[in-house]
Amino acid sequence: MEKILIFGHQNPDTDTICSAIAYADLKNKLGFNAEPVRLGQVNGETQYALDYFKQESPRLVETAANEVNGVILVDHNERQQSIKDIEDVQVLEVIDHHRIANFETAEPLYYRAEPVGCTATILNKMYKENNVKIEKEIAGLMLSAIISDSLLFKSPTCTEQDIAAAKELAEIAGVDAEEYGLNMLKAGADLSKKTVEELISLDAKEFTLGSKKVEIAQVNTVDIEDVKKRQPELEAALSKVIAEKNLDLFLLVITDILENDSLALAIGDQASKVEKAFNVTLENNTALLKGVVSRKKQVVPVLTDAIAE
């Protein structure tokens, strides 16, 4: 049987890695030949989950067409967030929980997008729908994905479905979701050894908002000041990326996972749109965003509206 590659977005987060592994597991149990792969380096939070549940990180790839004809996308659909040669392969399926944008195919496909907080929540349903048992280790990874995307159930993206799925998966994995989750998030929030280049690319996504090219990166921390004191270096790194990619705006969202607030650092010609979107005033290119923790639900929609006006 012809092999299929399953992967999430560039600059992978925990949901992207763990959902690729989980969906490949499900597809293989259903008789397919699927391999999970990744499009970037594994972050500290994800590595904690992989180590805890004794799972290998997926293989790193830059292109797919040299290996396979068909691919499955998880946790994304926008082409600029996907593999470099996405135009040269057939997208067979998409399992996602984000907006649909900049996406079209020449052939029909299976597309499943649900307004939940995490791709793994959808996959939990799909295991049940196919009467396939979720193994302990896979359940642990799926739980990790939900905890990550929902910031331990505190994010406004988190739904009752996510909470219910996490409860089921924690039971299968044999862990206390709150205790394990806090340890995992803290592992991801240790930024002390990261270079500024790593910080701004750990969880960065490029968007086309109206006619503007915007990159939004998010980092989690337990102390915003630890990141803010590196602001001169960060601004230089952001400006470099803006020049290289011809961006109109680079927005770095520094999220305090304990206080559930974020600091915005905005660089670029469209930085004033951040002020408009959040009704704040940028001082030295930064502004506190009270209660903002979700890029998907609290940043992208309002920034899209501000840029469109």
Swiss-Prot record:
Binding site residues for Mn(2+) 2: 15, 75, 97, 149
Subcellular location: Cytoplasm
InterPro entries: DDH_dom, DHH_sf, DHHA2, DHHA2_dom_sf, Mn-dep_inorganic_PyrPase
One GO MF term: manganese ion binding
SUPFAM superfamilies given in the database record: DHH phosphoesterases
Binding residues annotated for Mn(2+) 1, in chain numbering: 9, 13, 75
SMART domains xrefs: DHHA2 (SM01131)
Domain of life assignment: Bacteria
Enzyme nomenclature, EC number: 3.6.1.1
One of the record's GO cellular component terms: cytoplasm
Main subcellular location: cytoplasm
Pfam families in UniProt: DHH, DHHA2
Cofactor note: Binds 2 manganese ions per subunit.
Catalysis performed (reactions): diphosphate + H2O = 2 phosphate + H(+)
Keyword Cytoplasm: yes
Cofactor: Mn(2+)
Family: Belongs to the PPase class C family.
HAMAP family, alphabetized: PPase_C
Descriptive protein name: Probable manganese-dependent inorganic pyrophosphatase
Organism from which the protein derives: Bacillus velezensis (strain DSM 23117 / BGSC 10A6 / LMG 26770 / FZB42) (Bacillus amyloliquefaciens subsp. plantarum)
Lineage: Bacteria, Bacillati, Bacillota, Bacilli, Bacillales
Gene that encodes the chain: ppaC
